[in-house]
Amino acid sequence: MNALTTIDFNQHVIVRLPSKNYKIVELKPNTSVSLGKFGAFEVNDIIGYPFGLTFEIYYDGEEVSSDENRDSKPKNKIPIGKVRLLSQEIKDVNNDKDDGQSEPPLSIKEKSVSLELSSIDSSATNQNLVNMGSKAQELTVEEIEKMKQESLSSKEIIDKIIKSHKSFHNKTVYSQEKYVNRKKQKFAKYFTVEYLSSSNLLQFLIDKGDIQRVLDMSQESMGMLLNLANIQSEGNYLCMDETGGLLVYFLLERMFGGDNESKSKGKVIVIHENEHANLDLLKFANYSEKFIKEHVHTISLLDFFEPPTLQEIQSRFTPLPKEEARALKGGKKNSYYRKLRWYNTQWQILELTGEFLYDGLVMATTLHLPTLVPKLAEKIHGSRPIVCYGQFKETLLELAHTLYSDLRFLAPSILETRCRPYQSIRGKLHPLMTMKGGGGYLMWCHRVIPAPEPVSENATAADSSEKLAEHGAKKQKI
């Protein structure tokens, strides 16, 4: 089963709810997932379906409600329902009402709304609509809550709300659709399962409010960063990531395409300033620990700039033959393998900081870049890109001015991305009323190796005459 296109066990997915919110879920076998007021479902019921499908939670009367068995279950226990494809339900209704006429294709939500309003009268204008407030709705809040506790489907609840609305027929078709969509966001019990890509994870963090955690990143700025850095599957890249592992996830996804069994040998070397690297968000990446350990290596700034020498490592520890190591017992064996892990880590640091040159430098950090980038660039191969992301333009301007005067860097440029999303409704097109402003800035340049300055003939003659004069002066002293 392809985990990139098919829903499978033991993977993280992102669930889109009717309220346009998102929820990250880990699909463990034989467990249930609670979506709050939208219901709960069994994980086994959605396994094997492709990503992007919309499911509906429904109840056929066999489930135990929250009012029953109060002694064995808590009062707020959400009943677990069954799952069916929402598109399949709409398709069945369309087959029953098919009259042979072709209509333009609509989305699943538009189809469901159009079906609900097909048998309801509407007004051409809002001229006869009187704003009565809550008096226009005959159903009380208690009656609606009772229907929800009885586990009625969202369609039944919304139909009763529409029939009980005194002035619903005086609304225009567009106003009726907006009204139904608002009710669906409250009472609908459907959800969409999508693959948890790096872009979806970034959007989830932005919607959640963790903008400072991701340093005001946007999907557009990350896409431009990956293109400017020329990220490839066989490359070895130096990275500084202060977003909790999100930037590393973007790099891994561009290098390996989410394939957990990729044969590519590319690596990401993460430099961190603390005792341990913060790569917490990689737990959502659906990569195995073995894969991450093979392709992601971490090293502190101190070890990168001042690595241990070979003599220091060999003087502190010498590995034993395998037979002698196996013969150790008790605490000596544990102490030996702990020192062996330290020994292997020190050797890895030597390999990463030796004469090896990297294929690019990608940074998203709050450290002082004008002093840090020139030092890290010494480990970057010639004709390779350097891309630095920053929340503010001023920090990157200072970096660009520093690199302008350094012949090792070619054409430092500061870039900014702006994406203005539009909402498209049938017959209408306009920008979103609320949107995230900005997405950070990028500083991009190339690491080059300056050629030695050519020596002119006049300079050569002057040097030779100076040497002859010095030689004559020495003879006179003798």
Swiss-Prot record:
Any one GO CC term of the record: tRNA (m1A) methyltransferase complex
Keyword Membrane: no
Compartment annotation: Nucleus
Basic and acidic residues composition-biased segments: 464-478
GO BP terms, alphabetized: tRNA methylation
Keywords from the UniProt entry: Nucleus, Repressor, RNA-binding, tRNA processing
GO molecular function annotation: RNA binding
Entry keyword annotation includes Nucleus: yes
Region (Disordered): 456-478
Principal location: nucleus
Domain of life: Eukaryota
Note: Present with 2580 molecules/cell in log phase SD medium.
PANTHER family (alphabetical): TRANSLATION INITIATION FACTOR EIF3-RELATED (PTHR12945), TRNA (ADENINE(58)-N(1))-METHYLTRANSFERASE NON-CATALYTIC SUBUNIT TRM6 (PTHR12945:SF0)
Family: Belongs to the TRM6/GCD10 family.
Subunit (UniProt): Heterotetramer; composed of two copies of TRM6/GCD10 and two copies of TRM61/GCD14.
Function: Substrate-binding subunit of tRNA (adenine-N(1)-)-methyltransferase, which catalyzes the formation of N(1)-methyladenine at position 58 (m1A58) in initiator methionyl-tRNA. Also required for repression of GCN4 mRNA translation by the upstream open reading frames (uORFs) under conditions of amino acid sufficiency.
Protein name as catalogued: tRNA (adenine(58)-N(1))-methyltransferase non-catalytic subunit TRM6
Gene: GCD10
